[in-house]
Amino acid sequence: MNTFSVSRLALALAFGVTLTACSSTPPDQIPSDQTAPGTSSRPILSANEAQNFVAAHYFSSLTPNTAPWTPSAITLPAQPDFVVGPAGTPGVTHTTIQAAVDAAITQRSSKRLYIAIMPGEYQGTVYIPAAPGSLTLYGTGENAIDVKIGQAIDGEMSTTDWRRSVNPGGKYMPGKPAWYMFDNCQSKRGASIGVMCSAVVWSQNDGLQLQNLTIENNLGDSVDAGNHPAVALRTDGDKVQINKVNILGRQNTFFVTNSGVQNRLQNDRQPRTLVTNSYIEGDVDMVSGRGAVVFDNTDFRVVNSRTQQEAYVFAPATLSNIYYGFLATNSRFTAAGDGVAQLGRSLDVDANTNGQVVIRD
């Protein structure tokens, strides 16, 4: 049986939302029995309250008198700036994604640059640094699964093991654009690398666009049911767009932070992200972190093959001085196997955070 419930006061349901479990009737054909104000464990927004929780408000700027971000659909050029694929293939400029990213960042261009990725499996991390211009990475296959970026990284691994795993052959070296990101993590003095350095794809690029890709932390069920952060995608930049992307993992699958180049969380910055037409899979705190994130027409899938403990879809750490955290619209929530899948819990790591999620429509 697949059961969804709400943990703590982390999540509010907007008027008219439908959640189902153990039913053969299609979800869109079941009338909602949710009415405001709901209960202390399942707060429900009234129609008037729900009017405030729309994408335009999530994409507003923290800077006074600045217009909100109004993202438009991702458009692709007839000819990309860089092409990643097998050596010797006509048009290919690089055989690894990281090499193409490094080449793009090295140009120090203020315009958007496009990296096309041919179908195939690309093992290894991809670090996308902060830069004057924005990058678009997109798969050229028919489906998102045709381009797979993956590696197994456990946040509980030692710094030494992590260094050996993510930097074979000196992929990250002094003088290369992403060196500062690698160096911030390899310089950690703790017993383990931690969630902040466990990502397969990590971006600090403002305006980053990802489309038609699969990003997976391959750690999967190779570890026990304990604490094993294993981020597939981490984004720190503002105005990030993710469309038709599969984000796969277990714990902390998709991690949104507001960290600066020193890899430290900030209390005065709110990155904005739009996720559309995508698929996210995991178990514990599968979507977590700071920032304003709008999910539209996205599928969330909870899996319990690694742990039978309660799973959580959302774990926001919204800054307490900001009204908007995560918003899911026109989206679907499913779970595999038996057990309880919580829609969310607040990841209030300190006095500056008060997690907020709204699921509606």
Model regions: which residues?
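C-terminal motif of bacterial Sec signal peptides marking the signal peptidase cleavage site
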Residues: 18-21
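Sequence-level preference for short, compositionally simple segments enriched
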Residues: 30-361
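Bacterial signal peptide processing site
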Residues: 23-25
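Bacterial N-terminal signal peptides that target proteins for export
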Residues: 2-10
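Intrinsically disordered, low-complexity serine/proline/glycine/threonine-rich regulatory regions
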Residues: 12-14
